[in-house]
């Protein structure tokens, strides 16, 4: 298995925490989203590309597994990889770890569709983005990990 690629590094702030004292689920989603845009940029599907070419990406499936609480002051890192890329659809994974202990805090599997911004209809990725995405394909075991 080829290693996942680091796509985000950050910290849990006090205002990210809920009444139970740990990072609220909305912040997991937000941090995974930031990792997504870094992964897309590595493929050439950056926000600049989307704006200039009149394209968009739509998330059509997102599955998060929460494994360990993160608390205010904890640092975290997200590593990502493409699981599969087809002409119009990409499936990818994010793995969020506590940066100090290395423990997995959460995993996220997403499916995205490349589309026209105004037509809102799926369209093929340009070949260069498809090729770049293929170079980032990784295998990933969503089972119990240490």
Across the structure, where does each feature detected by a protein language model lie?
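Terminal targeting signals and extreme-terminal segments of soluble enzymes
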Residues: 1-77, 83-146
């Amino acid at each position: 298995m080829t290693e996942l690629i680091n796509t985000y590094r950050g910290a849990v702030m006090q205002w990210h925490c809920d009444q139970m004292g740990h990072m609220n689920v909305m912040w997991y989603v937000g941090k995974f989203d930031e990792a997504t845009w870094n992964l897309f940029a590595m493929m050439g599907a950056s926000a600049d590309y989307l704006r200039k070419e009149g394209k968009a990406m739509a998330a059509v499936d997102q599955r998060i597994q929460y494994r360990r609480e993160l608390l205010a002051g904890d640092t975290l890192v997200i590593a990502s990889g493409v699981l599969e890329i087809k002409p119009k659809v990409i499936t990818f994974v994010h793995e969020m770890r506590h940066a100090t202990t290395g423990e997995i805090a959460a995993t996220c599997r997403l499916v995205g569709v490349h589309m026209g911004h105004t037509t809102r209809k799926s369209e093929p990725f340009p070949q260069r983005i498809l090729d770049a995405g293929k170079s980032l394909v990784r295998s990933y075991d969503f089972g119990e990990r240490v």
